[in-house]
């Protein structure tokens, strides 16, 4: 009887202390400030009144009034936005394990990601670690990246041909982004499936990927009360599932073809996925299983999308800068001429091993990523448990995001931030040791930061340097007479592209 009483008292004391701790936690820490909200619908009415189409401008205005961390309510759940780089570092780097989770996916996203079985959407845990480790250790390690150098040269030849053809047929370049995306897709399809695909095959995969991409908005209504829409909107659900089935059919054709090959010159992403085993439960040493066909499709789709669009968009911005500011283009070219003095006429390509000598080129690319990051927000993060950031409550049931575009334009860290000035990334004419990972300090984060940082950021930087260097080495880029390069931005899916694509004439620099 005495032992039972003691155990009861201990349990009661612990329960009471936890209760008091929770009461104290929630009474001393409140959500970050934000605009007025209504029950159930949150801030939607307020956002519509304040030009929701310019969401970044709305957030910037709210931050100027409420401070560097604000709360919006879309429905009943809080969505927290951070504009301050120090708070971003505190969350993503110093407390990365807490701020690295993902929310449960919406019904349509669950279909597209095979129930969150890709790197981007998977919750923070053993599955996410397994998928990310497979990509970084098998495909993105330096020796494997180097093995694909011939692939990059091949896609560069495709890109050059696209530009030369348009210049010859139209008299100028106006579809730069389409050409850049197309050439990058050739490269990424080769890295993914291990095969140089024909033009019609590439177009088929591109179309399947594009249709799934636009489905996020086209079928978003299916995520509203899904138990109801599955009954009332059966035809729309059927259309959406047929779209996914079509994508799976296209991609699995190349996955299955690769699985039948006994040898391959270079390891491709599909090779690693066919051999990968993923955990069936969170605990270490638990049971494992092979990926399903649908999961392989989701991972291949993620690989193609994540490595194509942001890189192509950044290249568009960089080449627009070259056209708008001829002096910057001249400096990039003169640097290459100096480095390769005496061999200009014989050298047809700037090789990857030469890129480390091109400090000014690297500075131009970093400045463009600062001024025009391909995405102005990260994907939504979620905390693993209720926590505090900047003195405010960050609840587990909400989401938190970080305004990448604003951090790269912070006048407290960047002098004259709206001016394009590559020299800020140079020290005595040499490229400075800039920490892109934000480990020591976040000054800008075009690839994110912390545990969820883009695993392919180094590959993306290599692609930007290699393709831009060769486009400037092969051609002089000039603005079309009577045209101006407009650097206004607009959101397109997840990337920030040029509102008005630039037009240019290209002139071969050597015969």
Swiss-Prot record:
Disulphide bridges, residue numbers: none
KW Transmembrane helix (keyword) present: yes
GO cellular component: cytosol; endoplasmic reticulum membrane
Transmembrane parts of this sequence: 6-26
PROSITE patterns tied to this protein: CYTOCHROME_P450
Any matching Pfam family: p450
Annotated SUPFAM superfamilies: Cytochrome P450 (SSF48264)
Pathway: Porphyrin-containing compound metabolism; chlorophyll degradation
Superkingdom per UniProt: Eukaryota
Enzyme Commission number(s) of this protein: 1.14.14.-
Keywords for the protein's UniProt record, in alphabetical order: Chlorophyll catabolism, Endoplasmic reticulum, Heme, Iron, Membrane, Metal-binding, Monooxygenase, Oxidoreductase, Signal-anchor, Transmembrane, Transmembrane helix
Recorded topology in the membrane: Single-pass type II membrane protein
Cofactor or coenzyme needed: heme
Role noted for this protein: Involved in the chlorophyll breakdown by its action in nonpolar primary fluorescent chlorophyll catabolite (pFCC) decarbonylation. Involved in the formation of major chlorophyll breakdown products, including non-fluorescent dioxobilin-type chlorophyll catabolites (NDCCs), during leaf senescence.
Name of the featured protein: Cytochrome P450 89A9
Species per Swiss-Prot/TrEMBL record: Arabidopsis thaliana (Mouse-ear cress)
Taxonomic classification: Eukaryota, Viridiplantae, Streptophyta, Embryophyta, Tracheophyta
């Amino acid at each position: 009887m005495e032992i039972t009483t003691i155990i009861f008292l201990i349990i009661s004391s612990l329960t009471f202390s936890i209760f008091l701790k929770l009461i104290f936690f929630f009474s001393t820490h409140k959500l970050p400030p934000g605009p007025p909200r209504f029950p159930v619908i949150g801030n939607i009415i307020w956002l519509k009144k304040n030009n929701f189409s310019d969401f970044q401008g709305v957030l910037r205005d709210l931050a100027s009034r409420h401070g560097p961390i604000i709360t919006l309510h879309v429905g009943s759940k809080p969505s927290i936005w951070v504009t301050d780089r120090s708070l971003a570092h505190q969350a993503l780097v110093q407390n990365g394990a807490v701020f690295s989770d993902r929310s449960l996916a919406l019904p349509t996203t669950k279909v597209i990601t095979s129930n969150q079985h890709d790197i981007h959407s998977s919750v923070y845990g053993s599955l996410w670690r397994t998928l990310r480790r497979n990509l970084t250790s098998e495909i993105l390690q330096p020796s494997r990246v180097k093995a694909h150098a011939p692939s990059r040269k091949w896609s560069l030849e495709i890109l050059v041909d696209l530009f030369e053809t348009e210049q010859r047929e139209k008299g100028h370049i106006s579809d730069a982004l389409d050409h850049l995306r197309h050439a990058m897709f050739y490269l990424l399809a080769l890295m993914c499936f291990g095969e140089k695909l024909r033009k019609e095959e590439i177009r088929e995969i591109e179309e399947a990927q594009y249709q799934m991409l636009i489905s996020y908005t086209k079928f978003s209504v299916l995520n509203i009360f899904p138990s109801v829409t599955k009954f009332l909107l059966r035809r729309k659900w059927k259309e959406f599932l047929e779209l996914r089935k079509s994508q799976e059919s296209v991609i699995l054709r190349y996955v299955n073809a690769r699985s039948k090959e006994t040898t391959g010159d270079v390891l491709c992403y599909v090779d690693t996925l066919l051999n990968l085993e993923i955990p069936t439960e969170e605990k270490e040493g638990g049971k494992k299983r092979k990926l399903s066909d649908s999961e392989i499709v989701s991972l291949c789709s993620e690989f193609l999308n994540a490595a194509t669009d942001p890189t192509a968009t950044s290249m568009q911005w960089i080449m627009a800068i070259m056209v708008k500011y001829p002096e910057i283009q001249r400096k990039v070219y003169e640097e290459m001429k100096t480095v390769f003095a005496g061999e200009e006429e014989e050298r047809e390509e700037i090789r990857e091993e030469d890129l480390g000598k091109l400090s000014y080129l690297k500075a131009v690319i970093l400045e463009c990523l600062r001024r025009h990051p391909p995405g102005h927000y990260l994907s939504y993060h979620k905390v693993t448990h209720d926590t505090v950031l900047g003195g405010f409550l960050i609840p587990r049931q909400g989401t938190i995001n970080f305004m990448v575009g604003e951090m790269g334009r912070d006048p407290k860290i960047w002098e004259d931030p709206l001016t394009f000035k590559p020299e800020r990334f140079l020290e005595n004419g040499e490229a400075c040791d800039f920490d892109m990972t934000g480990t020591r300090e976040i000054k800008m984060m075009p690839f994110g930061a912390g545990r969820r940082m883009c695993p392919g950021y180094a590959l993306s930087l290599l692609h930007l340097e290699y393709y831009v260097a060769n486009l400037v080495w092969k051609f002089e880029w000039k603005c079309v007479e009577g045209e101006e390069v407009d650097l206004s931005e607009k959101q397109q899916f997840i990337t920030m592209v040029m509102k008005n694509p630039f037009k240019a004439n290209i002139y071969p620099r050597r015969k």
